[in-house]
Amino acid sequence: MEGFSPPINTAQVDAKTKLDEKVDYSNLPCPVLYEELNREATMALKPELFEGFRLDYNKSLNQKFFLSHSILMGPTEVPNPTPSSEIIKIPTANYDFGAGFIDPKLYLIGRITTDGRLNARAKFDLTDNFSVKANALLTDEEDKSQGHLVIDYKGSDYRTQLQLGNNSVYAANYIQHVTPHLSLGGEAFWLGQQLMSGVGYAARYETDKTVASGQIASTGVAVMNYVHKVSEKLSFATDFIYNYLSRDVTASVGYDLITRQSRLRGKVDSNGVVAAYLEEQLPIGLRFLLSAEVDHVKKDYKFGFGVNAF
């Protein structure tokens, strides 16, 4: 009839909208580093747990230079000389001193401990796309010193790395966005000391609310992670690790809760391990830390508390 228009088919409108929203494959985003594919799950499921008392003090001397002091007092696990599965711990205390220089194109960070360990890291951005990173660990223990060099190149929608280490360690990886949400990558490595080589493959899918990633390597390990962001303050994470050579399986689930003055992370895994980590911001320039881990199978219990001053 005149004056009436035909009803609108919403399905046809949605289909037309999707066709109109064509993907510009020449303008895809740059992916995360290959080694950081699981960073969201790692942050939620693997906080820096500790046992005993920990005190950290960081002092900025100017906008680029800072000093740090750290004290850790608590038990340390040592190998059991008997066939018993009992865990042996001895009381220890350790202090480390650190210094750092941070610039938009260069950072240098070094730490030395009372047990004779020197840890140094450096990164230099040669251009906006090309950077070099170096890590070194020096110790008086035989065959424990390490050196690692990473050359990183970042393209518009891809990243690639070349890694060189002592003991004839060579590795290379490449990752690229193939759609606005999906990135695919692979790696190859050679371990000269173990006379072992291998390859690996990875995929990562991310949206505003979810991140899913998976990796598999010829060494026999497959890893899958999923993180769901419920709100700006709360997210849940889970991971699944399977070694198809030894048939070992580990699964874990956890959460990450961020409030105005605190952050609480916790997890439980299929090995019977329950852990929690709390960071509480105090109004006087201090951060209070609580760390707890319970291994019901091994009957191992760890508790720690600390203070971070800045």
From Swiss-Prot:
Q: Which residues carry this modification: N-acetylmethionine?
A: 1
UniProt record similarity statement: Belongs to the Tom40 family.
Query: How does this protein assemble?
Result: Forms part of the preprotein translocase complex of the outer mitochondrial membrane (TOM complex) which consists of at least 6 different proteins (TOM5, TOM6, TOM7, TOM20, TOM22/TOM9 and TOM40). Present in a large lipid-enriched complex called mitochondrial transmembrane lipoprotein (MTL) complex made of proteins located in the two mitochondrial membranes, including the TOM complex and the core components of the MICOS complex and containing at least digalactosyldiacylglycerol (DGDG). Binds to MIC60.
* Alphabetized Pfam families for the sequence: Porin_3 (PF01459)
Q: Which terms in the GO cellular component ontology are assigned?
A: mitochondrial outer membrane; pore complex
Q: Which GO terms describe its molecular function?
A: porin activity; protein transmembrane transporter activity
Q: What induces it?
A: Up-regulated after antimycin A or rotenone treatments.
Per UniProt, which keywords does this protein have? Acetylation, Ion transport, Membrane, Mitochondrion, Mitochondrion outer membrane, Porin, Protein transport, Transmembrane, Transmembrane beta strand, Transport
Q: In which tissues is it expressed?
A: Expressed in roots, flowers, young cotyledons and leaves.
UniProt subcellular location: Mitochondrion outer membrane
Q: What is the protein named? A: Probable mitochondrial import receptor subunit TOM40-2
Extract one GO BP annotation from the record: protein import into mitochondrial matrix
* Topology relative to the membrane: Multi-pass membrane protein
Q: Which residues form a coiled coil?
A: none
